[in-house]
């Protein structure tokens, strides 16, 4: 057997074996995301209704609030990721971010103006910005390279299962008259606090497979690059130690362009209402979307470990473009139901593989910073994406706005296929092929 044929045969052998169980960190972080999304998705599908009917906010105003909220989170994503690399401590930032969101989110229940909702949403997303990159880096650190897609897929599936249960709780509470809207928002403090307790008591800084990669890389460094006690300077000053590389930056540029099509999903809920879906069924529609997201996320992430990230991401982005074209042409309530279900496949096929590809392209010592840049790019794009979509909707109609989003997604898909490389060299080093 030649050296050239050994790696592919080894990959085939690994793919035929049962998957090893995921480590506790991944499972607990998945549970935390489940609880957080239960709380978040009780609120989110009802927020457009609350803003438009209770506070009288227009489509452009909705886009402004959600755009600022998502972009505000980007202010902390990069420095949080960088700091978690610098200190090699992910958990404190993850706990802080989830705590801020858990405390801020219920306050929507006492908001009396659009400005107050904006402040609350910005605080909520600011917490998300603090936690996201360190959490993703912690997941990547906790598993071997050939389990990354699966780990991120399971994490996204748990997140989406929470997003199924949250709207169902909201629908049940409101339908049965157990509480009015503002009281329901206040109740979201309960799952938020429970998620923080899980983090504090059960998640540990990792010393797993990816940490071993970093120790091996550090051991290979010249003695002149270590301090008197032995730790490599790369661990202490990762920002200047290892470049992220051109392939990573090309991926980031294309993801930023695609993210300009990612206006807030609140517009999809408004479009569904416009097409005739009743307010009582909006939470059920939102839950149905997340059933598809949850079931497809675990499959999509794991499949990307076997067939590669590129086919899954391209397929997901293509579905996104087609769904937006569908919303532009839709004219009946059942169109909204069908499009929401197909829309769930986009998330399942692309979210986990995108994050796994970021981890593939980033050196182990820079994963926190890499996820910081990735999440910052998506967050920064959210503001112009949502504001532009809302303005186009108000001036030229929903059909034009959705067509614009589909066009941006289509162009981004073509660019992804042309300029984003398959990370073959690093995949071989980490045992992926």
Locate the predicted segments by residue.
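Helix-loop boundary and gating motifs at the non-cytosolic
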Residues: 16-74, 248-285
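C-terminal membrane-cytosol helix-exit motif in multi-pass small-molecule transporters
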Residues: 190-214, 412-420
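Juxtamembrane intracellular "pre-TM" segments in multi-pass secondary transporters
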Residues: 2-23, 205-255, 433
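Structural signature of the two symmetry-related core transmembrane helices
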Residues: 92-106, 189, 311-326, 406
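Helix-to-loop junctions at the C-terminal end of transmembrane segments
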Residues: 76-88, 174, 296-309, 393-394
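Intracellular juxtamembrane helix-capping segments at the cytosolic ends
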Residues: 130-143, 349-362
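Transmembrane alpha-helix termini and helix-breaking/packing motifs in multi-pass membrane transporters
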Residues: 49-54, 165-185, 384-400
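Helix-loop junctions at membrane interfaces in 12-TM secondary transporters
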Residues: 107-120, 328-339
């Amino acid at each position: 057997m030649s050296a050239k044929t050994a790696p592919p045969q080894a990959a085939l052998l690994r793919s035929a074996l049962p998957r090893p169980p995921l480590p506790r960190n991944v499972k607990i972080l998945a549970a935390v995301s489940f609880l957080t999304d239960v709380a978040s998705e009780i609120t989110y599908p009802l927020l457009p209704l609350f803003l438009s009917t209770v506070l009288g906010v227009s489509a452009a105003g909705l886009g402004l609030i959600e755009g600022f909220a998502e972009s505000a989170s980007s202010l902390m994503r990069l420095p949080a990721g960088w700091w978690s690399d610098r200190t090699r401590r992910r958990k404190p930032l993850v706990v802080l971010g989830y705590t801020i969101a858990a405390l801020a989110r219920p306050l929507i229940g006492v908001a009396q103006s659009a400005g107050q909702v904006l402040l609350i949403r910005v605080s909520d997303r600011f917490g998300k910005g603090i936690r996201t990159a360190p959490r993703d880096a912690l997941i990547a650190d906790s598993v071997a390279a050939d389990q990354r897609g699966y780990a991120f897929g399971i994490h996204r599936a748990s997140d989406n299962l929470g997003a199924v249960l949250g709207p169902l709780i909201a629908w049940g509470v409101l339908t049965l008259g157990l509480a009015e809207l503002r009281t329901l928002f206040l109740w979201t403090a309960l799952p938020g606090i429970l998620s923080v307790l899980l983090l504090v008591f059960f998640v540990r800084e990792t010393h797993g497979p990816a940490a071993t990669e970093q120790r091996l890389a550090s051991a290979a460094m010249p003695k002149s690059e270590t301090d008197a006690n032995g730790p490599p300077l790369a661990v202490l000053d990762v920002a200047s130690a290892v470049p992220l590389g051109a392939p990573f930056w090309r991926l980031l540029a294309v993801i930023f362009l695609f993210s300009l099509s990612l206006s807030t999903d609140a517009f999809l809920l408004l479009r569904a209402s416009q097409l005739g879906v009743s307010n009582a069924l909006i939470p059920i529609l939102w839950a149905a979307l997340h059933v598809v997201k949850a079931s497809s996320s675990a499959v999509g992430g794991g499949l990307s470990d076997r067939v590669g990230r590129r086919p899954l991401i391209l397929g997901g982005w293509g579905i996104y473009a087609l769904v937006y074209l569908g919303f532009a042409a839709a004219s009946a309530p059942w169109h909204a139901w069908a499009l929401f279900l197909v829309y769930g496949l986009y998330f399942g096929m692309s979210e986990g593989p995108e994050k796994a590809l970021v981890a593939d392209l980033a050196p182990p010592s820079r994963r926190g910073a890499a996820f910081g840049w990735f999440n910052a790019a998506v967050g920064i794009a959210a503001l112009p994406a949502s504001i532009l979509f809302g303005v186009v909707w108000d001036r030229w109609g929903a059909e034009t706005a959705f067509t614009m989003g589909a066009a941006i997604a289509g162009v981004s898909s073509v660019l992804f296929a042309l300029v984003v490389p398959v990370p073959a060299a690093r995949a071989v080093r980490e045992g992926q092929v």
